[in-house]
Every structure is written in structure tokens, then in C-alpha cells.
Amino acid sequence: MFVTLIKPLARLHPRAWDFVQLVRLDRPIGIYLLLWPTLWSLWIAADGVPELKNLLIFVLGVILMRAAGCVINDFADRNFDGHVARTKARPLATGKISVREAWITFAVLVALSFGLVLLTNATTVWLSFGAVAVASLYPFMKRYTYYPQVVLGAAYSWGILMAFTAERGELPASAWLLFLANVLWTVAYDSYYAMTDREDDLKIGIKSTAILFGDADRLIIGSLQGLTLLLLALAGSRFELGLYFYLGLAVAAACFVWEAWSTRDRDPQACFRAFLHNHWAGLAIFLGTVADYALR
């Protein structure tokens, strides 16, 4: 549906689709995986009634910052992507978009995001600098550490902190439970993603948790998902959430079980489907959160 909505952009200019691909608007899974935990937190921070202004700011901010993250990622990987089957057609790798054009795109996206943050409060503005720093750092970590997914987890969890400060003007200690839960969840699902490229990454020297975990990959991913659910349950207790929130967690748990079963042979396509499937887990938790507040 999302891709259908943006298809008309290809007719605006002969090169428009190249930029759509650069910022991955044609692959919205990253938007969803960033959006759901941000919205969990926005709803919890606002006791179920977030300000419309903040809702719009965070939805647009998620789209813009995920796009910016894709640009800096492709810049960092431009000399590697051509050697990986899944990424060899990316616009920077093929030369359809120049490095200069990529940097201009990145700057515009960050500037627009910052303009949105300026509509919140000082604490959230200060936090936004950390968001840009972590998002920019992640792509380069793949050269130096087997834990780039942890950095990605921090980047994908930063919106949780900002949602609380935007709604409450402060950051309660319990918000860190949501932050840590999302970091662990991100490491889990991005490890599935890294499993699809593991053989290519080994050849070109790119590091990932999928390589680090080796034959224990599915066991460790399952353990991370279990810890994610435990931390979310603890957060639910701290924020006095009820039955529907925990039903959302139960659906997410079922999603995680399906992912473990479907990747039992470690087929790269199955691992990629498991990665995509996490969107449904995040959506289930969000719907459970919304229902819990709405039906009180």
C-alpha cells in the first residue's frame, strides 16, 4: 500500500525513483520498525491521549530520520554494496546518485527533522543531537565491531526517550525499560536481517551479530526476544498498563515463535521474511497499548 502511494513520484522526474530508492521509501519496513516503538512510548507518556501536534511531529520525524539514516548508510557502504547480491543495485553503488547529491539529501532531511523538533521543547531538542549522532555512527561500526546492531538499536530507540520528553517535559526512569527492550528487539530482528547477507559479509570483511553468533544465532535471537518481552512486561507494570497491553505482548510472542520456526533451516529468504515479520509484532504491541488506554 505504501509503495503504491509513492509510485506516482517516479513520473515527476526521470531521476525521482533513484532518490526514492536512496531513502528507501520503496521499502517501508524500516519506517514501521522505527514507528511502532516510538508510538508505544508516545501513548504511554501521554496516558493514552498524545497531543495531535506531537503525534504529527513524531510520525513525520520517523519518516525523515529513517530516510536520512538510509542515505548515510549507503554512503558508508557504497564501496561494499556492489559486492552483495541484495544491495548491488542501490543508487550510490551503481553511480546513479553521486556522493555530493547524497550528502545534500542527507543535510536536507536532517534539517527538516530538526525543524520539527524545534516545535517541541528544549529537552527534546537537546536529545535530538544524540539521535543524529547515533544514526550517523551506526553504518561505520560494521567495519570495526561485531555489534553494529547494538548501535542500530540505540538509534531506533532514541525516539522513545524523545517521546517522553516531548509529552512530559522530563524523562522518567521507567522509560529506560522501554528503551532497553527496544534495543534488544532491534538486535534480534536485525540479526535475522544480517543472516541473509552473512556469506557475502564474510567475504568482504563486514562484521555483524549474525557472524558473531554463528551456529547459536537462532538461540541467541530467541533469548533476546524473550528478554524484550520481559522488559516490556516490567514497563507495563511500572506504567500500570492492563490486560490489552499484555495481550499485545502475547501476540508479539507468537510472532517470535513463528520466526524461530520458519528460520530453522537458516535459509536466507526465510531469515529475511522473519526480519520483515517483526513489523507485526511491533504493531500488535502498539494496538494493545492503544486499546488498553481507550477501553478503560
From Swiss-Prot:
Keyword Chloroplast attached: no
The UniProt record lists the keyword Transferase: yes
A Pfam match: UbiA
Biological process terms in GO annotation: ubiquinone biosynthetic process
GO cellular component: plasma membrane
PANTHER family assigned: 4-HYDROXYBENZOATE POLYPRENYLTRANSFERASE, MITOCHONDRIAL, PRENYLTRANSFERASES
Similarity field: Belongs to the UbiA prenyltransferase family.
Protein name: 4-hydroxybenzoate octaprenyltransferase
